[in-house]
Each structure stands twice: as C-alpha cells, then as structure tokens.
Regions:
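Acidic, contiguous N-terminal accessory segments
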Residues: 1-109, 321-334, 339, 465-482
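Generic recognition of stable, solvent-exposed alpha-helical segments in well-folded globular domains
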Residues: 25, 124-127, 188-195, 254-261, ...
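Short glycine/serine/threonine/alanine-rich loop segments
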Residues: 36, 137, 203-205, 325, ...
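Flexible loop/turn segments at secondary-structure boundaries
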Residues: 119-121, 147-153, 214-220, 276, ...
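Active-site neighborhood of glycoside hydrolase catalytic domains
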Residues: 220-226, 237-343, 348-361
C-alpha cells in the first residue's frame, strides 16, 4: 500500500530519532546503508512508534514536518528504516512525502552463497550482507564445505583446513575449477565466523551454516582418511561432479566421531536455531560393496542403500536437537524415510518436489533451480557467463515464480524462498555482482510481495531507481534486458 502526498521532508545528515526502546542497533544499520549519522534523542524529527501490525509489518509516513514509522517491534521498525534508507538513496536529502504500509509474504527470505568451490573473503561477505539487508532478506545460507574445499576451521580436526581447504598439483585435493599452477584455497577462522555472525545480526540477518553430507565430502575425506575411509570398500560410483570418493560411510565409527565434533563446534559458532546438513546428490552405487555398510543394513533390517543415508541424517537430526538446533537439508534428506518432520526441506530440483514435501507435512523452503538459481546464465548468448544445466534464467523468469500457488492445500508449510548462487564460475567480486544483480531484486519481490502486488510492469518501473542505488554502492550488475 503506497500513497504519495504533497511536499518534501528535509533529511539532515545528523537527524535525531526517538522511540520506545534503545535504537543503537537499528540506527547503526540505517547509517551503514545511507552514510548518514542518525542518533537517538527525545527532541527528534523521526519517530518510531509502537502499533498493532503484523510482526514484520510497518507503516512509514513522511510529511514535510516529520517521519513516523509504526510497527509492532524491532523487525518492523527495521524494515521501515530500510525503506527510508532506499528512499534517501534515491532522493538525497529532500524526500518526497508518502505513506507506505507493508508486510512480507514469507518469513524466510534467503540468499545462498557457495564459498567452497571458490573462496570469498569476509569483506566480500559483509558487502553481500549489507546488500541483502537493503532488500529485506533475513537469511544468509552459507555453504562452507564441498568436494572442492573445506572452508570452516574446526579445532578438533585442524587437518580439515590444513589439507581440505587447499587444492592444487601434488596436493591431496587436486586442481580443479581455477587456480592455475599455484595452490588455491582459504578458510574462515572461528574468530572471523563470530565476527561475521555478529555483523549479520546487526543487519537483521541470521546466518545458516551448511555442512554438506554425506555426499560432497571429497575434501573432508582427503583430510581425514584414517577416520573416513573403509579400506575394504569396493563400491564403485561417480557423482554428478565426477568424484568417485566423495561420500561418507554411515557404518564407520570414525564418521560419527568426525560429524559429532563438527556439529559441536558449528553449534557453538552459530547462535541461530538452524543448521543445514546438505543431503543432496548421493550417487547411485555407493555403499553396495562396503562390508561395514552391508553389515549395518543386515543389523537394522534395511532393504535399500538409501536407508543408510536416512540412518546417518537421522543421527545428525537427533544430535542437533539435543543441542537445541533444527536440522535443515536439501530435498534428498527424505531418502530412506528416517528424518522426522521437524526437519525443514529445501526443494531445489522443482517446485513439485517442494509441494510434495509440504503436502507430507514437512516445512519447506522453495529454491527450485529453474526459477531461483542465480548461477544459471541469463541467456544462451555465447558471451553470457553462467551454467545451463537447468536452463537459462532472466529477470522476468525470476520475478514470475510463485512459491505457494493459491490452490495448494498445504501453503502453511511453505516458509519462504532461497536464491542460491553456486560458485564454480564465480572467480571475482565483479562476477559475483553480475550474477546476483538485478535478479536478486526479483527474488526479494517474490519473497516479500503477494501475487496480487507482484506486478511485473510495476517492478520494471521501479527498477531504474534501484539501479541508481546499486550504482552508488558500486555494484557491477548486469544491465537488465527482460
């Protein structure tokens, strides 16, 4: 709901704000987005007022004399201040008067970044978090481990980063994707992780860590072969990414020693209530000729090797629950039918996969590749960077997706949306910008707006103002073409 009114409000660089609670964190966020220096003071021109509105809803009113943001609490005030920051970025110190009443469609509004295939610095991640906050995203899904690199310091197993964080000629993890003749890699220390978690919290964003198991574990297995390799295993398999040694063995005691230690440290580092344990792309043929796995299957009465995946993920879910955490995972966590409905399913292969999980009673985050994967190329132009395995993805396609169709009977189980950016081809900050923007703005609208208010022509009309903001922030976005 938006109504333009007459006049302008002059926003001073050091304007004062008052409110019913201490506002230092909210004002620090606003100042970070705008470069202004607002402070809290009773003699104020900007007022934050308590009101009966949805938990994340807000009402922003700008008149020539004052600015008033009404909300039920901190989340709504934050959104109102972010909208004010966008308005200030577009119009400078003379703000056109208006009234906005708004609230999000979904409570989960996420961006995913793969930092395993290519390593992205803490400075780059802070920049991304700031950009996310400007468009009211509230979850950052941090993909920290994969076949090509282990990026998180684990004090119980320093080999994970000493060995698993680096790839190159003559190293345990061989050269791949990029890096040339020199070793390539990097990892995040625990102090850096705590710093980033605190920074994100100040922007209203919760970081969800992902430790991807039981597949995508080549780097971990190379770092800890004494724990994670069964010498007698003769199983033959090949993952989608052409690894034949990237799956944890659910029958080895070392697997649980490794995972429990990792989960202990992850739970300590990330105060949020959720941990993502991957679960995707376990290849066919794994565990079939593992004596330990065959013995475990016989002991448990399992008939299908996929039940071993469920066995391992059920252990992780129960272990995390004892620490007060909820397990999240890609849609394949349902394989083997061992994970309870307290787990949240991230649907990535299709909308239908998410609808099926929601209909079965699982909470679902929608992330279908054909509609929301930002590593896909914009078009089939030979000069356009990106991947094609799920087709191409332009701005209009992102904007058009509807995660929760009106005629679906279990929409209450659909928590929100996630746009992933996998990093096989993301070798620089400029390429990161190009793949994210402006498609990330369309994801923001999908996550925030109801279908009735998500109108393509309106989005396009507002886009130049947003590109102006991105120019100010020195974002090297792709110039949009439908």
């Amino acid at each position: 709901h938006l109504i333009y009114t007459e006049g302008n409000f002059r926003l001073a660089e050091r304007a004062h704000v008052d409110g019913p609670v201490p506002l230092s964190s909210l004002l620090a966020h606003f100042n970070e987005l705008t470069g202004l220096a607002l402070t809290q003071d009773h003699d104020a021109e900007i007022h934050l007022v308590e009101a009966t509105l949805p938990p994340e809803g807000y009402e922003l009113t700008i008149t020539p004399e004052e600015i008033v943001i009404r909300a039920a609490g901190e989340a709504g005030w934050r959104h109102g201040l972010v909208s004010l920051a966008q308005w200030a970025r577009q119009h400078g110190e003379s703000l056109p008067c208006l009234t906005v009443r708004d609230a999000p469609r979904f409570g989960f509004r996420g961006i995913f970044l793969d930092c395993a295939r290519h390593f992205h610095s803490i400075a780059t991640l802070k920049r991304l978090l700031k950009q996310m906050s400007l468009y009211k995203f509230n979850r950052f899904h941090w993909h920290l481990t994969d076949d090509e690199g282990w990026r998180l310091e684990i004090k119980a197993f320093p080999q994970l980063t000493a060995v698993g964080a680096w790839r190159g000629h003559g190293l345990a993890v061989g050269p791949q994707l990029s890096g040339g003749l020199d070793p390539y890699g990097g990892y995040y220390t625990q102090s850096e992780v705590r710093e980033l978690v605190a920074y994100a919290a100040g922007l209203g964003i919760t970081i969800i860590p992902e430790i991807d198991i039981p597949g995508h574990c080549h780097a971990a297995i190379k770092a800890l072969p004494e724990l994670l390799v069964e010498e007698a295993d003769r199983s033959r398999y090949l993952s989608v990414q052409y690894f034949d040694d990237n799956v944890l063995n659910p029958a080895l005691p070392g697997t649980y020693e490794f995972l429990d230690a990792v989960m202990d440290e992850v739970c300590d580092l990330f105060p949020g209530s959720q941990v993502h344990m991957g679960g995707d792309e376990v290849p066919t043929g794994v565990w079939t000729d593992s004596p330990a796995c065959q013995q475990l299957m016989a002991e448990q009465g399992y008939q299908d090797c996929r039940e071993l995946q469920g066995h391992l993920l059920r252990h992780c879910q129960q272990y995390l629950a004892r620490k007060g955490k909820q397990m999240l995972g890609w849609e394949e966590i349902l394989h083997g039918d061992k994970v309870s409905r307290e787990a949240t399913v991230f649907a990535w292969t299709s909308f239908q996969a998410g609808l099926d999980a929601a209909a079965s009673g699982y909470p679902v985050v929608m992330a279908p590749a054909q509609h929301l994967y930002l590593d896909l190329a914009w078009s089939q132009d030979i000069h356009e960077p990106g991947l094609y395995w799920a087709g191409t993805l332009n701005l209009a396609q992102v904007h058009a997706c509807d995660p929760a169709p009106a005629d679906f009977h279990a929409n209450d189980n659909i928590l929100g949306v996630l746009s992933p950016l996998w990093s096989e081809l993301i070798t620089s900050r400029d390429r990161l910008d190009y793949m994210l923007f402006p498609r990330m703005l369309a994801t923001a609208e999908v996550a925030w707006s109801t279908p009735a208010r998500k109108v393509w022509e309106h989005f396009v009309a507002r886009l130049p103002g947003q590109l102006h903001i991105l120019d100010q922030l020195q974002v090297r976005y792709r110039v949009p073409q439908r």
